[in-house]
Swiss-Prot record:
Residues noted as binding ATP in the record, renumbered to the chain: 12-20
EC number(s) given by UniProt: 2.7.4.25
Domain of life, source organism: Bacteria
Gene behind the chain: cmk
Protein name: Cytidylate kinase
TM spans (from-to): none
Length: 229
């Protein structure tokens, strides 16, 4: 791991906007991007495809260590593309059912350990923007800037509904809200690396903020710390 490259971590619950913010921020800075949540979603999706039970920690650990994954950076007018075993899965892994599976496998210590070094390997020059749930508390505890981004469950469900509407059949706002609340409980109550802000994190509630307003706050913190040079 390159200890020189700076890291900005953006943690928060599902639907808080951290992925969107992290992607735009990484592109603006010209830095690398780690979407750690995608790794857990990919593992849950791969487990389903291979018939691996989400409670089988040993098999999940082996699957995590050998995931055939490719991240293709976003370009103008296009979102980041994610390839699993040769197939593009960028949209399908964003469904709440896959997200629920990701939350289950993320609670398993052996799985988290298997993916830890894989995540840390993303820390390369000129810098890294890492988004997830334990980026600032576990994966990059020495990051010079840590953001914890949240929003009300209702607002997060609304955002996810707009994101999935037209892409996923049968999606409803009420079911998304129920799933988000259930996932919040799992993520905050798990024994290993529970979702919580780092002690030195800047906490931002984005319920009433636009993406641009959130980015403006973060860019101000970057300037104060002179992180990007």
């Amino acid at each position: 791991m390159n200890n020189i490259a700076p890291v900005i971590t953006i943690d928060g619950p599902s639907g808080s906007g951290k992925g969107t913010v992290a992607g735009i921020l990484a592109k603006r800075l010209g830095w690398n991007l780690l979407d750690s949540g995608a790794l857990y979603r990919l593992l849950a999706f791969a487990a389903h495809n291979h018939g691996v039970d989400l409670t089988n920690e040993e098999l999940l650990k082996k699957l995590a260590a050998h995931l055939d994954v490719q991240f293709i950076a976003a370009t103008d007018g296009q979102l980041q593309r994610i390839i699993l075993e040769g197939d593009e899965v960028s949209d399908v892994i964003r469904t709440e059912s896959v997200g629920s599976g990701a939350s289950q496998v993320a609670a398993l210590p052996a799985v988290r350990e298997a993916l830890l070094q894989r995540q840390r390997a993303f820390q390369e020059a000129p810098g890294l923007v890492a988004d997830g749930r334990d980026m600032g508390t576990v994966v990059f505890p020495n990051a010079p800037l840590k953001i914890f981004l949240t929003a009300s469950a209702e607002e997060r469900a609304r955002r996810r509904y707009l994101q999935l509407k037209g892409k996923v059949e049968g999606v409803s706002l009420s079911s998304l809200l129920d799933e988000i609340r259930a996932r919040d409980e799992r993520d905050t109550q798990r024994a290993v690396a529970p979702l919580k802000p780092a002690a030195d994190a800047i906490q931002l509630d984005s319920t009433e903020l636009s993406i641009d307003q959130v980015l403006e706050r973060i860019m101000s913190e970057i300037a104060i710390r002179d992180i990007a040079g």
